[in-house]
Amino acid sequence: MLPDKIIYEGKAKFIIETKDPLTVIQYFKDEVTAFNKEKYKIIEGKGTINNRISTFIMETLEKAGINTHFIKTLSEREQLVKKLKIIPLEIVVRNIAAGSFCKRFNIKEGEKLAFPIIEFFYKNDGLADPMVNENHVLYFGWLSYEEMEEIKTITIKINTVLIDLFLNAGIDLVDLKLEFGRPINDNTKITLADEISPDNCRLWDKNTHKKLDKDVFRLNLGNLKEAYLEVAKRLSVKLC
């Protein structure tokens, strides 16, 4: 049973208050959504799988020198994380053409990009998370120029680490969505937030290009839980 002190509910997680004002609990739900919540389902066990995968990836990134909000795993569904002031942007880095990128630029799905492309999206469900450029980011004060450059540098480093991590598991990292924030006691420290799991990465089998991410649900391609379990297995993530 969840405690009463839920301070935020997202599509896939609850954020829960703790006695420490500098930390919160991130609770992984079994809900899965697509198309701005137009498609919805509860898949038993999805939250526990994502918790374990994200824990493994956050620990890998910390070892690589990336500052993340992750502190420790508390249970099969819960993580203790730093409390952040979330920056209202989603940063997407693309390595292979897929999804909306193909529609916007009339590019065939699966085309390998010559270099990683970074895109910014304004986090606003009511506006359907519109794509924005760097001038928008500066104009609305979401980031300073220096912070924007820092986030781009961090994003490329994360992408590089994860490309290698997944490649060693026989998986191509097609694209990746990241969120960042600032600790409430240090407004200058850009910190990786949220989760990294098949919910917010596109992951394809390197040889067959079989989808192993939320597109399985989005596009009705089969059993989402089986796909996520396959990712965990290939990464040697322990689920119990």
Swiss-Prot record:
HAMAP family (alphabetical): SAICAR_synth
Gene that produces this protein: purC
SUPFAM superfamilies recorded: SAICAR synthase-like
The keyword ATP-binding appears for this protein: yes
Enzyme class: ligase
Species annotation: Wolbachia sp. subsp. Brugia malayi (strain TRS)
The name this protein goes by in its record: Phosphoribosylaminoimidazole-succinocarboxamide synthase
Biochemical pathway: Purine metabolism; IMP biosynthesis via de novo pathway; 5-amino-1-(5-phospho-D-ribosyl)imidazole-4-carboxamide from 5-amino-1-(5-phospho-D-ribosyl)imidazole-4-carboxylate: step 1/2
Catalyzed chemical reaction(s): 5-amino-1-(5-phospho-D-ribosyl)imidazole-4-carboxylate + L-aspartate + ATP = (2S)-2-[5-amino-1-(5-phospho-beta-D-ribosyl)imidazole-4-carboxamido]succinate + ADP + phosphate + 2 H(+)
Phylogenetic classification of the source organism: Bacteria, Pseudomonadati, Pseudomonadota, Alphaproteobacteria, Rickettsiales
Enzyme Commission no: 6.3.2.6
GO biological process annotation, one example: 'de novo' IMP biosynthetic process
Family indicated by similarity: Belongs to the SAICAR synthetase family.
Family matches, as InterPro entries: SAICAR_synt/ADE2_N, SAICAR_synt_PurC, SAICAR_synth, SAICAR_synthetase, SAICAR_synthetase_CS
Source domain of life: Bacteria
Keyword entries, A-Z: ATP-binding, Ligase, Nucleotide-binding, Purine biosynthesis
Keyword Ligase listed: yes
GO MF entries: ATP binding; phosphoribosylaminoimidazolesuccinocarboxamide synthase activity
Record's GO cellular component terms: cytosol
